[in-house]
């Protein structure tokens, strides 16, 4: 008798995706982040569902409802902080996952890569709208500033912003629709994840060497299921350390003040995971130019596969590209720091230099390094 997992229509899909899946024998811990992102998404959907049971999306009661969750609901504080810090863990895993893709040349799987970029945009949109929901000072002013950026679009900009707001300012209509979108988007993300995996399983996983490893594949279970479980434990440990010891470490104190349209906070800034893009936005004195740079800072990922000039897929054996890659990481950390600083000297100049360096490394220096490395191969 054949095993049920190989014959049952539903279990067969699970079997081919998680049990009998042939996987390269040499994939490192950098390949753990895909499953960790799946775990993060599940944590966010579950905690979000329980928060939605007690939250009210009305400007008059939104802030109070969050306070009520933290004070009166059984373990409400835990659910709320798991959700808030879970988002931070989500983005840490996301950025590491993307970084892994760039380093090891996984972007050559075009369909998987492009769905990944769409996923990144969807997660960023979800996180932004979620930040607005507690209706604190930074929620309100963050929503005002970021949605206002769309007014830079020629001709239709102002109309578009008012259409998104549902009025002439960020108000009740905005909060209600943001809650609706924030609730539905994670399920759309989950569907996109399925497509992401579908495309990945068409080609199979990449590996650190970047060389096809078909001659030496091992079953996903038990080898990588155990490895993923270890990753889960580490992620949950780090998340619980954050939630139970310093839940407000990554948040903004201004968000503990109820939203007040008449009082602007001295420094309006988004959550830490958007600061690098925010720094790029601020480094350009022109509004439309800034918005274009902001969008391009993420959309540039879609251009990376077409800038791959190297004869090797992975950066594992490409020292010049490796140095540039780590300079890029340092540059992103610098941008993250600058995004949280006030707009004054010397931060303006540092931000502009870091922004130019960011685009230069990806668009010019990395392709050049690849060509030089190709030449070195012939020596």
UniProtKB/Swiss-Prot annotation:
Gene Ontology biological-process entries: mitochondrial electron transport, ubiquinol to cytochrome c
Protein name stated in the entry: Cytochrome b
PROSITE patterns cross-referenced by the UniProt entry: CYTB_CTER, CYTB_NTER
Entries under SUPFAM superfamilies matching the protein: a domain/subunit of cytochrome bc1 complex (Ubiquinol-cytochrome c reductase), Transmembrane di-heme cytochromes
Cofactor(s) needed: heme b
Remaining remarks: Heme 1 (or BL or b562) is low-potential and absorbs at about 562 nm, and heme 2 (or BH or b566) is high-potential and absorbs at about 566 nm.
Residues annotated for a ubiquinone binding in this entry: 201
Binding-site residues for heme b b566, renumbered to this chain: 97, 196
Xref: Pfam families: Cytochrom_B_C, Cytochrome_B
Lineage: Eukaryota, Metazoa, Chordata, Craniata, Vertebrata
Keywords: Electron transport, Heme, Iron, Membrane, Metal-binding, Mitochondrion, Mitochondrion inner membrane, Respiratory chain, Transmembrane, Transmembrane helix, Transport, Ubiquinone
Transmembrane segments: 33-53, 77-98, 113-133, 178-198, 226-246, 288-308, 320-340, 347-367
Organism this protein belongs to: Lepus mandshuricus
Name of the coding gene: MT-CYB
tRNA processing recorded as keyword: no
């Amino acid at each position: 008798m054949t095993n049920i997992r190989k014959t049952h229509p539903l279990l067969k899909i699970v079997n081919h995706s998680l049990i009998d899946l042939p996987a390269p024998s040499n994939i490192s811990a950098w390949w753990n982040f895909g499953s960790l992102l799946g775990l993060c998404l599940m944590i966010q959907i579950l905690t979000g569902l329980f928060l939605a049971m007690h939250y009210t999306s009305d400007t008059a009661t939104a802030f109070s409802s969050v306070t009520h969750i933290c004070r009166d609901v059984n373990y409400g504080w835990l659910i709320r902080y798991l959700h808030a810090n879970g988002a931070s863990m989500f983005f840490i895993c996301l950025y590491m996952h993307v970084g892994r893709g760039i380093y090891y040349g996984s972007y050559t799987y075009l369909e998987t890569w492009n769905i990944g970029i769409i996923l990144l945009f969807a997660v960023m949109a979800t996180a932004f709208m979620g930040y607005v929901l507690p209706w604190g000072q930074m929620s309100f002013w963050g929503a005002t500033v970021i949605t206002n950026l769309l007014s830079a679009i020629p001709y239709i900009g102002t109309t578009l912003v008012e259409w998104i707001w549902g009025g002439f300012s960020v108000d009740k209509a905005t909060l209600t629709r943001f809650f609706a979108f924030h609730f539905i988007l994670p399920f759309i993300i989950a569907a996109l994840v399925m497509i992401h995996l579908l495309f990945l399983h068409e080609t199979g996983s990449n590996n650190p060497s970047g060389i096809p490893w078909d001659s030496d594949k091992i079953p996903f279970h038990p080898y990588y299921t155990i490895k993923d479980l270890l990753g889960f434990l580490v992620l949950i440990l780090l998340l619980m350390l954050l939630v139970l010891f310093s839940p407000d470490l990554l948040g903004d104190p201004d968000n503990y003040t109820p939203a007040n349209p008449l009082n602007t906070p001295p420094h309006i800034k988004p959550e830490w995971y958007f600061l690098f893009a925010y720094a790029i936005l601020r480094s350009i004195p022109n509004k439309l130019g800034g918005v274009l740079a902001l969008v391009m800072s993420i959309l540039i990922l879609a251009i990376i596969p077409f800038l791959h000039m190297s004869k090797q897929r992975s950066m594992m054996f490409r020292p010049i590209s490796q140095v540039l890659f780590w300079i890029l990481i340092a540059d992103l950390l610098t941008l993250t720091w600058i995004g949280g600083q006030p707009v004054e000297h010397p931060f303006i100049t540092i931000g502009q230099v870091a922004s130019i360096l960011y685009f230069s490394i990806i668009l010019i220096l990395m392709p050049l390094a690849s060509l030089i490395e190709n030449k070195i191969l012939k020596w």
